[in-house]
Structure formats: structure tokens, C-alpha cells
């Protein structure tokens, strides 16, 4: 019986790989976070609004730079309408080229949610995730051709829970950053971000991660 079992294993090629558990994923994130300083990628975003049962989609490119917990990010949306989004410190800007208008928002204390909402998993250590979230493994799935472990994160902070119900991350079996994120709000809305053509720690100047605006742009501050 033992020889038959061995023969069957050899014929199949090898024993199946052990399942990627939470500790494995968090260890990879710890390792990557130690040297992480930025990433570029193609981005597709799906936004679901529960009250009207509506989905909207956008796609473009993203440049993200992290220094400690400081995030500088630029997103260039091409489809369906061109626009640019920039986030730096506690400020967010949205530029509409067809109107030559930039809207500037003061994120204030909500600026900390950028790390929780937009940049989670990019340079985040596994230790930080465990500190701020209850982390569970939800199985393995393939995203953009990459076998990935899906993690579910529930915020431990009551204040964060007011804004974010939970976050799902798809982490490739050979990487420490997500190829997909899904952020759920308490009311049933969600945001799905999927990434491709990712380049880790690109050799780019800091200016590449900042919003580029024409000198004659019209500024608006909707909060005032």
C-alpha cells in the first residue's frame, strides 16, 4: 500500500502545496514593508452604491509613495472621463482637465483614513495590520492570473468602524502587497480596486507621485 501511495504521488508530480495561512501572508508583508517606498500600477475601480443599486467603473494608472505613514499618491483616470486625483499629507485634490478646474479638500483628521482606505497593504507591515485589524483568512482565489490569499480585515477602532465596515485584500502567494482590495462601508456601499502591471519600488523622482497642474488652473475649495 505504501509503495502504491508513493507511486501515485510521483505520478501526480508532487504533494499539494500547504495552504497559505494568515501568518505566512503577514510575514511576507513584514518583509516587503521593510524595503517598500513606492509602487506604480494600472488601476480599475468599481464603486457600488447600495441605496440605488448602482455600479460605476473607472480605470487609469496609480503612483503611490510611502514614507513611514506619510502617503503621497497620484491617480490618472482615463475612462470614462479624464480626471486626476492627488493625495498628500492631509490634502486631496481632484483635477478636471476639460474644465481646467481643481477642487481642493482638507482631509483634516480624516487624512489618517487614507492609510486605512486607499493605501492599505502597500508598505503596510503585517504587524501594523494585526494591531489595527482582526485578520482572518477567507480562502484562495486567482486575480489577474495570480493565485492569491484573500484576507478579511475588521477594524478594531470604533471610529474607523464608523467609516469602514471591513476590508478584503487579495495577496499573491509570492508577494507582500495586494493585487485587489475591496472596502465596505457600513451602509452597504463598497469600492473594489484591482491592480495590474505593478512595479514595486520604481526608480522615479518624488514629483512623479504628485499631481501635475497647469499654471492657469482654476481653484475651488468646496468645503468653504
Which residues make up each language-model segment?
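Hydrophobic h-region of N-terminal signal peptides that target proteins for export
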Residues: 8-19
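N-terminal mature ectodomain segment of secretory-pathway/periplasmic proteins
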Residues: 22-94
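Short, solvent-exposed helix-to-loop capping segments enriched in aromatics
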Residues: 33, 113-130
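Acidic/charged, solvent-exposed loop-and-adjacent secondary-structure segments enriched in E/D, K/R, S/T
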Residues: 93-121
